[in-house]
């Protein structure tokens, strides 16, 4: 049974009374509970718009979006967003206090809060780092704290918008492995936005490839069976890469030919 459903979703942005831009048109997608779904596509194809609609930050112009059969009409605790930067961490709080923030707002007792925060610190590989402030942590560690903090709110789904995009290549690969471990431990459903084909193959159960904008929708969905393999030289990885790259290249070439004709 699908956890998330997009049905014929349309999103039009109005610049002024006479100018509009249709980012999405006829967008359909189902994401299953416990699934890790990666959304990939050319720049400007509407990937982040899809995430913002599911997060409730934007309202669709047409169509319907449901989570667990309930219409999405705004932000909610059942969805947690992890952004690319680390600005969402509270600089004046320790790592543990950042993780405790949500449970404290829900009235969870102090002793239970601390135990919960420590369990998530352990889950993200940061045991013993709870008393440090964000400025004392590396970029990768800050992202792990962000993930731990949103998981402490026990969401039905994680929404991740290129969360590792600002990290160096080596740290990014470490974080991909860590995120795989975290997902295997929690099986919280994930919508992961990326422009990196490698990253999508390593992380995703399925990869949705979007058409170039405007009026974007899903071009294809590729089922991935890497089963925890992070070797980019593995024959299975290479085959998936070729398949996904061909889909995206087709969209990019089509856009370039249209621009040339114009």
Question: What are the residue ranges of the model-derived segments?
Answer:
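Catalytic Walker B motif of ABC-type/P-loop ATPase nucleotide-binding domains
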Residues: 158-161
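The feature captures the beta-strand-to-loop junction immediately N-terminal to the Walker
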Residues: 40-42
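Short coil-to-helix segment of the ABC ATPase nucleotide-binding domain corresponding to the Q-loop/switch region
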Residues: 93-100
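Conserved ABC transporter NBD signature motif
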Residues: 63-75
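Conserved ABC ATPase "signature" region
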Residues: 100, 111-129, 181
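Helix-to-loop junction immediately C-terminal to a conserved catalytic motif
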Residues: 55
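Conserved ABC ATPase signature
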Residues: 133-137, 141
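A short, proline-enriched helix->beta-strand linker immediately N-terminal to the Walker B motif
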Residues: 152-156
């Amino acid at each position: 049974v699908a956890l998330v459903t997009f049905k014929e979703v349309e999103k039009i942005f109005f610049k002024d009374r006479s100018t509009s831009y249709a980012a999405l048109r006829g967008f359909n997608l189902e994401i299953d509970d416990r699934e890790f779904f990666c959304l990939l596509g050319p720049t400007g194809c509407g990937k982040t718009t899809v995430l913002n609609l599911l997060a409730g930050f934007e309202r669709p112009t047409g169509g319907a979006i449901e989570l667990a059969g309930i219409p999405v009409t705004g932000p909610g605790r059942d969805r947690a967003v992890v952004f690319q930067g680390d600005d969402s961490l509270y600089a004046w709080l320790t790592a543990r206090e950042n993780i405790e923030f949500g449970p404290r707002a829900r009235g969870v007792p102090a002793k239970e809060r601390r135990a919960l925060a420590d369990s998530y610190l352990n889950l993200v590989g940061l045991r013993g780092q709870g008393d440090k402030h964000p400025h004392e942590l590396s970029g990768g560690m800050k992202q792990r704290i962000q993930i731990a903090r949103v998981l402490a709110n026990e969401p039905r789904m994680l929404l991740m918008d290129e969360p590792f995009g600002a990290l160096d290549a080596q740290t990014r690969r470490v974080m991909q492995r860590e995120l795989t471990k975290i997902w295997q431990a929690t099986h919280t459903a994930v919508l992961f936005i990326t422009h990196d084909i490698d990253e999508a193959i390593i992380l995703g159960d399925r990869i949705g490839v979007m058409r170039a904008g405007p009026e974007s929708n899903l071009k294809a969905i590729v089922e991935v069976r890497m089963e925890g393999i992070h070797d980019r030289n593995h024959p299975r990885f290479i085959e998936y890469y070729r398949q996904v790259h061909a889909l995206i290249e087709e969209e990019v070439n089509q856009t370039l030919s249209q621009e040339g004709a114009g």
